[in-house]
């Protein structure tokens, strides 16, 4: 039986709920602040009439959404290029993306600042932090001997592949699920994390599974695999599709959605900001994450896979998991890689 999960308030990542109507009227929702000594109460009153986040769409049960993608193992998308032990920065193939990065002297990585635990703006320092941020820094460490030689550019989930194809960034490290369709457009590293889609609900809501979502509003994200999954398992729910993961926290706090759904790793980051929320229900869909490069940038993908191999072997992956994702529970270790030549 799958047990529900909830986060107790701790640390600077906790986001306070805003209890004052005046604050809500100014659009100040989910404001970052120091951890309180007791659980903050849920918002009092009805704020469901407030405008939805910019770019949000309401999709009724009859809406046609992209179909659930096939299992990525069925098309070989989970098999990435084998690391080359002889591939080093100084031996990068001339004219390759890897050689251009080495010549530039820094790595440019696309991510976002709204995915708590993976890539977020630390309110105490103002710097980008999280599992994905540290992963990018490890790639820079292997490229230049210096984890600080990385430039982060902020992207939305919807714009990450376009930014890559415009060569605005060298890599995308942004909690990106590997799918068959995406693998025809971009190159993926080996799997560096496996998440499972679940539900995030207000504590005491009575929602414990997708069967409880009939007639309810469920927040999820535009252009993600989560949208197709929730329509399949909760066909009578209305979907609130938003462009930014943090928008689901806002819609839940204002009563504009009854539940949110996406990867449990991302939901845990939202729940860490509001202790009145809990993760419930069964695992709905496996979501394997990969680092993303432009299609045919083979040397760069092999180099990234070499970094991931090193992180598995020297314990770096486990240290990053314990630092950022330990609230998900004990880990069996990093996913085993699958390679092709």
Regions found by a protein language model. Give the residues of each.
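Extracytoplasmic small-molecule ligand-binding "clamshell" domains
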Residues: 47-172
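A ligand-binding cleft/hinge motif common to bilobed small-molecule-binding domains
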Residues: 175-184, 253-286
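Extended ligand-binding regions for polar small-molecule ligands
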Residues: 53-92, 224, 291-329
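Beta->alpha turn/N-cap motifs
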Residues: 111-115, 154-158, 167-179, 203, ...
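Periplasmic-binding protein-like
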Residues: 193-201, 268-305, 327-341
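Acidic, polar ligand-binding/catalytic clefts
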Residues: 137, 141, 148-212
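Short loop->beta-strand "edge-of-pocket" segments that line small-molecule binding or catalytic clefts
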Residues: 108-111, 129, 210-224
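Bacterial signal peptide processing site
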Residues: 34-37
């Amino acid at each position: 039986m799958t047990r529900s999960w909830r986060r107790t308030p701790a640390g600077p990542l906790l986001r306070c709920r805003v209890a004052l109507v005046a604050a809500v009227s100014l659009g100040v929702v989910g404001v970052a602040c120091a951890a309180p000594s007791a659980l903050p109460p849920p918002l009092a009153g009805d704020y469901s009439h407030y405008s939805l986040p910019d770019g949000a769409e309401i999709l009724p049960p009859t809406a046609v959404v992209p179909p659930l993608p096939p299992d990525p193992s069925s098309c070989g998308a989970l098999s990435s290029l084998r690391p080359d032990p002889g591939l080093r920065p100084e031996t990068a193939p001339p004219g390759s993306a890897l050689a251009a990065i080495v010549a530039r002297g820094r790595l440019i990585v696309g991510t976002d600042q709204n995915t708590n635990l993976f890539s977020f703006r630390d309110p105490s320092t103002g710097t980008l932090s999280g599992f994905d941020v540290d992963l990018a820094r490890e790639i820079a460490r292997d490229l230049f001997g210096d984890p600080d030689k990385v430039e982060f550019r902020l992207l939305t989930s919807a714009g990450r592949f376009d930014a890559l194809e415009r060569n605005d960034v060298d890599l995308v490290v942004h909690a990106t699920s590997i799918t068959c369709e995406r693998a025809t457009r971009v190159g993926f590293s080996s799997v560096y994390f496996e998440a499972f889609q679940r539900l995030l609900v207000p504590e005491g809501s009575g929602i414990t599974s997708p069967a409880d979502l009939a007639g309810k509003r469920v927040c999820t994200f535009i252009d993600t695999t989560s949208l197709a999954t929730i329509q399949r398992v909760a066909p009578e729910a209305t979907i609130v599709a938003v462009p930014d993961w943090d928008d689901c926290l806002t819609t839940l706090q204002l009563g504009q959605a009854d539940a949110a759904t996406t990867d449990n790793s991302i939901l845990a980051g939202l729940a860490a900001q509001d202790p009145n929320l809990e993760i419930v229900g069964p695992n709905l869909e496996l979501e394997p994450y990969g680092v993303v490069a432009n299609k045919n940038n083979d040397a760069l993908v092999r180099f990234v896979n070499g970094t991931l191999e090193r992180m598995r072997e020297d314990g770096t992956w486990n240290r990053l998991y314990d630092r950022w994702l330990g609230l998900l529970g004990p880990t069996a270790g990093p996913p085993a890689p699958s390679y092709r030549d």
